[in-house]
């Protein structure tokens, strides 16, 4: 961050971790009502993430399981499995839209209630969806995947000066065989290349949580360490 740039940072109370049952979670939270895109992207480079209007970063007293991960767009090479995913989804139409819709929420509700009924986001509600996904000072884009007009999947995506940030993805569980979660990331990578972006930020890799350990499959990738961003080419951190 430039030496002339200052932001206020608060710290949350300890609370039960949403991802690891035996851990307590604590967050650094940016205390600014508005962030311009350049500052927001710089905070991403420092390991922060967006949830709704909030910008946060884990600062847990006894755990460092959350590892910020990004994929360099120009270096990315899909694996054989990812190529098969692309092949079986070549009949899908990709749309980029700038507004959320009732159709998006209906799909989100179905996804949460069927796939994450054992998690903290269940049961889904419109208020929860809007608070989590939307942002007043940086409206996201929405990557849609459609099959003959039917909405199958959505990736909520922030567009920054030199990167895309994957905020959240949801899809129709009735089409599990299509690997739509993976397809959405591959689509974001392709869109980032078309936009001449340098990175796609995928969020936090958490090896100990089976639902949060997929990000390292998109290679090569970089993880944020105490020494800066570190390059990896294998599936293990």
UniProtKB/Swiss-Prot annotation:
This is Aspartate/glutamate leucyltransferase. SUPFAM superfamilies: Acyl-CoA N-acyltransferases (Nat). GO terms for cellular component: cytoplasm. Its EC number is 2.3.2.29. Its main location: cytoplasm. The keyword Isomerase does not apply. PANTHER family: ARGININE-TRNA-PROTEIN TRANSFERASE 1, ARGINYL-TRNA--PROTEIN TRANSFERASE 1. It catalyses: N-terminal L-glutamyl-[protein] + L-leucyl-tRNA(Leu) = N-terminal L-leucyl-L-glutamyl-[protein] + tRNA(Leu) + H(+); N-terminal L-aspartyl-[protein] + L-leucyl-tRNA(Leu) = N-terminal L-leucyl-L-aspartyl-[protein] + tRNA(Leu) + H(+). Pfam families: ATE_C, ATE_N.
């Amino acid at each position: 961050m430039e030496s002339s740039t200052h932001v206020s940072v608060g710290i949350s109370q300890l609370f039960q971790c949403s991802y690891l049952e035996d851990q307590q979670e604590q967050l650094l939270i940016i205390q600014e009502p508005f962030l311009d895109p350049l500052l927001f992207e710089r905070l991403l480079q420092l390991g922060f993430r967006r949830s709704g209007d909030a910008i946060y970063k884990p600062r847990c007293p006894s755990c460092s399981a959350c590892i910020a991960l990004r994929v360099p767009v120009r270096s990315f090479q899909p694996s054989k499995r990812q190529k098969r995913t692309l092949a079986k989804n070549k009949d899908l139409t990709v749309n980029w839209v700038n507004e959320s819709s009732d159709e998006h929420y209906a799909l989100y509700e179905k996804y949460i209630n069927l796939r994450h009924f054992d998690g903290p986001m269940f049961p889904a509600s419109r208020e929860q969806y809007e608070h989590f996904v939307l942002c007043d000072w940086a409206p996201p884009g929405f990557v849609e995947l459609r099959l003959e007009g039917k909405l199958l999947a959505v990736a909520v995506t922030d567009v920054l000066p030199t990167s895309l940030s994957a905020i959240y993805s949801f899809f129709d569980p009735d089409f599990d065989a299509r690997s739509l979660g993976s397809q959405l990331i591959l689509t974001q990578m392709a869109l980032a290349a078309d936009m001449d972006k340098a990175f796609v930020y995928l969020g936090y890799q958490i090896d100990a949580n089976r639902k949060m350990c997929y990000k390292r499959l998109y290679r090569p990738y970089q993880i944020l360490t105490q020494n800066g961003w570190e390059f990896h080419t294998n599936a293990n951190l």
